[in-house]
């Protein structure tokens, strides 16, 4: 059953204001903090301006690909509720979670069943699992049937070419949260 939504890749104040002040704002709003290849990347100076807004009922999410100490130190004072982390080991995520006292969305990029089964490794360090495609900013899809049968005791979010006009019935059986790209 879908319990929430996330809009990811917000990079301008007008869009952010619209989303936050919408009668049905998303539960999560994501900002791409260190993946410079993305057209939705937001540098620290712009992040400071964007995140000065009243976030209303939404949670702010720092989207981080293999974050290093430099970026983590730069964003630690910003009002992020969650760090969404790609390409880190469970030990690296545990260290980040403990040092920066943030809730963690562990992003697992999915190509096949082997990728799906990696979720077990992160059970002690994640607050939310995100199953995404291998495409990062390319908004590629993955076969959602790969995750239909797994049983996870934490919220499960899916991303990867999910469109606002998709039939949500397709996702209700497998996800608690839908991640829609803001790009």
Where do the model's predicted regions map?
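Conserved N-terminal beta1-alpha1 strand-loop-helix module at the mouth
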Residues: 1-183
């Amino acid at each position: 059953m879908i319990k929430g939504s996330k809009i990811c890749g917000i990079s301008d104040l007008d869009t952010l204001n619209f989303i936050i002040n919408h009668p049905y704002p998303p539960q999560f709003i994501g900002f791409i903090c260190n993946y410079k290849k993305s057209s939705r990347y937001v540098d620290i100076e712009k992040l400071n301006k964007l995140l000065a807004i009243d976030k209303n009922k939404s949670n702010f999410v720092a989207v981080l690909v293999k974050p290093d100490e430099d970026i983590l130190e730069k964003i630690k004072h910003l009002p992020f509720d969650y760090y969404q982390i790609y390409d880190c080991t469970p030990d690296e995520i545990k260290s980040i979670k403990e040092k920066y006292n943030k809730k963690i969305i562990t992003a697992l990029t999915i190509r096949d069943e082997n990728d799906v089964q990696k979720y077990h490794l992160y059970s002690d360090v994640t607050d939310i699992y995100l199953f995404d495609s291998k495409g990062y900013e390319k908004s590629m899809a993955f076969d959602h049937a790969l995750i239909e049968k797994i049983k996870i005791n934490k919220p499960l979010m899916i991303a990867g070419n999910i469109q606002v006009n998709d039939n949500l019935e397709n996702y209700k059986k497998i996800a608690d949260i839908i991640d829609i790209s803001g790009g």
